[in-house]
Structure formats: structure tokens, C-alpha cells
Amino acid sequence: MKYDKKYVRNFSIIAHIDHGKSTLADRLIEETGMLTHREMSEQVLDSMDLERERGITIKLKAIKLFYKAKDNNVYILNLIDTPGHVDFTYEVSRSLKACEGAVLIVDATQGVEAQTLGNVYLAIDQDLEILPVINKIDLPSADINFAKKEIEDIIGLDAENVPAVSAKEGINIVDVLEDIVKNVPAPIGDENKPLKALIFDSYYDFYKGVVVYVRVFDGCIKPGSEILMMSTNKTFEVTECGYTSSGMISTDEISAGDVGYVVCSIKNVKDARVGDTITDKNNPVDKPLEGYKQVTPMVYCGIYPAEGEDFNSVRDALEKLQVNDAALTFENETSIALGFGLRCGFLGLLHMEIIQERLDREFDLDIIATAPSVIYKVHKKDGTEIEIQNPTNFPKETEIDYVEEPVVHAEIMTPTDYVGVIMELCQGKRGTFIDMTYLDEKRVTIKYKLPLNEVIYDFYDALKSKTRGYASLDYELIGYEKSNLIKLEIMINSEKVDALTIIVHEDLAYERARKIVTKLKDEIPRHQFVIPVQAAIGNKIIARETIKAYRKDVLAKCYGGDITRKRKLLEKQKEGKKRMRSVGSVDVPQEAFLSVLKYDEVN
């Protein structure tokens, strides 16, 4: 379908988690009459059950709306929804590249938050026109003037005529549409130049194969044409193209300036990478669009089936999830304690939790997940350097020259009352203070350099609980730094449990070890014999707790009488327990593995 380009508007909606981004998208869809109120399921763009339940957008979607504006022209609005969570920053940056404008939602009750700011910087990097919108004005605690002041002071945008809306109640939605029509620039692009298009999303369809969402910058895509993916150099033939509106609507072509989907019998999402450039096989462009990067996992953890024979089912399930999620990686690994399993790589903690939940929900699998870890660079004395994802493979202390760990630059926005507790939390997590800026008399931004290893465990939860949910966090990886790290091993009944091994900083080793053994003592059920729970560094035990045994009262039948008879029975019982301990095995429940992650809750 061809439109006059001057009536096309490509925009996305950016916001902090929970500021009402998907709800506003729904109201825009309703207002333009694409779906009736009856057809609307809450959050149309969030199609995964999990997305709706957690109220977050994980994968982004693109949808075409037709809006008749007050000037009586019909405008074509391409709305590209973006995930707001820090784990998915790369996906946000790609979808912004497909737009000319961004609607920035600011919550009237909370003002500008850390990830709002993070996303604004991404939009500024892409030279987008930013249109602020104040949402949630229906709430009793809404303060529109406060939100306007924050938009002007913190982001530096003029907030005089900013639309104030309630996406939930559908108040003032037309103002947002008019704002988009007036202020978002029309796309530029030449249909006669060679094809140049950006992939900003892809998903797997069981009938069509991989469906790729693209923004065409130059040229056009038609069924039958042969296209080339520039990062992988693979070619495919286009079988269908079109756009998403109330459903998938196929068209004759997608031309320069427009957004749509392309089907070309691709079997694996890895061949259609987000951020890649598509061009014509017979008439390619010289260089791809800039900004493409291979997404690399930041957090790793082991996933094991609770029942050993389910290993293949878990692997198949992960393969199916990977088809839709190019950022998920996995490889086989074995553990003495848990048997066969898979070492999986994720973008961050939220990404990890979502994959684990989907394994449970969509595939009904019972899994055990080990503590997450990051990639360490170990420089050995013989001059070699190795990368360690699994703490079990950490070399002996005698072989190590020095170790480097990944560090992040964290930005925390918080009300001024909580500055003290946040600084205390960051110092406790081995943070280095960088800078503190007062945004106004009530709010402050604190910048810290933190080891990623500390952020992935429970930093986010601790931050939220210490600040009653008011603080918000944004972080980015800045590189590797030297650190005194050691391997802490946990022994249960004198046997090392490799799945509980973690890498800790030397100064925190004793404290962590104490907390972990105390946690495990509470989580592991009592057996018929005494179970020692120990934490060791190398051959040195640094902490121990004992799980007491159940005891049968062997003296119940003895009334009075000779002490030697009682002693004999007790000795016999002791002997039996000793024998039992040497042959008995200890069942470690999944809760015990999880408790290691939440070691900070003990204090």
C-alpha cells in the first residue's frame, strides 16, 4: 500500500516500568477506532500472559493506526511499543531507531524516574522529537504541576502545553493524538534508491516461520524479491509482506518511510537479528545502518530438571523459547549434585525470571535453578586468560595471578529522605561513590560504580524495600576491573554441592558463608542422622552449622534399674546413626538453592 509520506507518523512510547505505557497504547488503539471497546483485552500489545500478569512489556510490537485529525486529514500512525525494563535496553534503542518521534510518559504521582531518564537519553541519541505526556491524572495523589516542573528541570523539555491524560479512564487521549500529528516529523526516504530496512523485532510463527518487523528507510520490499541480511550474509525470498492492524493484513509492498512485517521462510530467529539491516540481494547498499550489535548475555545460571529423565524436555522447551528470544543462550553441563542440566545466559535478572516462569507455565516443567553468576576473567600465573561462567570451574587459588569482574555504572533516583540508606546499601555491595546531584529539594540522583555480581543477587529487591519502593534504578555495563575474588564452596554431610558454589569477594567471604549455612540449616529438613553444613575456601572450613537428627526414645522401656543398661542402648543407637550417616543421602529441596540467593534477608 502506498501513502503520501507527509501523512505518515512513526512513533514509539517510552516510560519507566508501570507508568502506563501499554495502557496508553490501548487507548490510542481504541480512540482511532481500530478495535471496539468489546474487542479490547486489556493491553492489546502485551500478548504473552506473563506480560499481562507482571504488567510489563517484554517483546515489542508494531501496530498501524488510521486517525482522522482535526484538520480533516487521515494520518497513518505507526505505533511501536517498547519494553521499559533495564534488561531490554538494546531492544528499546532499536525500536527508537525505527521512529521519528517518541511519546514520553511521566507519572503524575511519581514524576521522572531513573529508567525514564535512561530511555530519554536513548531517544536523544537517535535525534527523535520527544513529546512528554503526563499520565494518571485520575489518581488522588496526582500532581500535574510537580510533573511539569520535573519534565522542565530534569529532562529540559518545555512542559507548558503538555497533554495531561488518564490512560486508564481514557481522559484527554485526543490531545495526545493531535500532539503526535503536529509535532512528530514525517519520515524521509527515497523509494528509487536500493533497499535499506532495519529489523526491530522478530517472532516465530508455527505456520509462517519467522515474522520480521521492519522499518524501510529507502527502496521498497515486495513479495518475490530476494533480500540479504547484512550481518549474517544470508539471503531469503520474500513470500509475504504487510502490516499489523486489527490483525495481520498483507499488502503489495512496504515502501520507504513505512513500517510493516515481512515473511520469508526463515527457520530461526538467529537469522533475523534485531538491529540488522535488510537490503536487496541484487542491488545491495554499501554499508548497513549503524548501531547493530550482537546481544551478549550478562547473567548465567544452571537450569536442571527436578527429575533426571526430564532433561530432554527442558532442552526442547529452551530451544522453543530461543526461537523467539535471540538473547537467550544455553549449553549442556553436568553437576555432581543435580545430574544433567543446562547453563543458560540471560540479559539480566528479570529476563532470567521470565524464562524460568515460562518453562514452568507454558511447558509445565519442574526445574531447579542455581544461583546466578556473571562472567569473570581469570588471569593465570602461566600467562593465559580464561572466562568463567560457572563458579565450579574457578581454578585453584595457587594457579591464579589476578581476577577481573564486570562492573556497572548505576544511577539511582530517590527522594532525599533515603540518601543515607541507599549509600549504606551501595557501600555494603562494594560500590564506589561517583556523584550526587539534587534535582530539586525533594529528589536526588546518586551515581555509583558497582560490581555486577552484587547487583544481580538481590540489590534491586533491597533497594526497593529500603526506600519503600520510591527509588528507581538504571544501570549499564562499563567494563572489567581487578578484584580479590575467591571461590566459596558449600559442603552438606561432608560432600561438596557444586550447584551451591559461589564466587565472593575476600572481605565478605566469612559473613556470606555464615549467612548461607544458617539459611541452609533452616531449609534442609532433618534426617535420621546428624548433618553438618559447612562452607569452605579451598581446604579451610570457615563456617559450620549442624542439622540435628531425629531420635527415637530408646530408653522408654527402661524403668529405674542399672545405668549401664541405658548406656548400652544409647551407645547402640549412636553406632546405628553413625553407620546411617556414612551411607545415607541428604535431600536438598529447591528452596535451599533459592535461599542462597536471598542471603541478605537474614539480617
From Swiss-Prot:
Chain sites annotated for binding GTP: 18-23, 135-138
Alphabetic keyword roster: Cell membrane, GTP-binding, Hydrolase, Membrane, Nucleotide-binding, Protein biosynthesis
Record-level GO BP terms: positive regulation of translation
Pfam families: EFG_C (PF00679), GTP_EFTU (PF00009), GTP_EFTU_D2 (PF03144), LepA_C (PF06421)
Annotated PROSITE patterns: G_TR_1, G_TR_2
Catalytic function, reaction form: GTP + H2O = GDP + phosphate + H(+)
InterPro entries: EF-4 (IPR006297), EFG_III/V (IPR035647), EFG_V-like (IPR000640), EFTu-like_2 (IPR004161), G_TR_CS (IPR031157), LepA_C_sf (IPR038363), LepA_CTD (IPR013842), LepA_IV (IPR035654)
Keyword field contains Membrane: yes
Compartments in which it is found: Cell membrane
GO annotations of cellular component type: plasma membrane
Family that this chain belongs to: Belongs to the TRAFAC class translation factor GTPase superfamily. Classic translation factor GTPase family. LepA subfamily.
Protein name listed in UniProt: Elongation factor 4
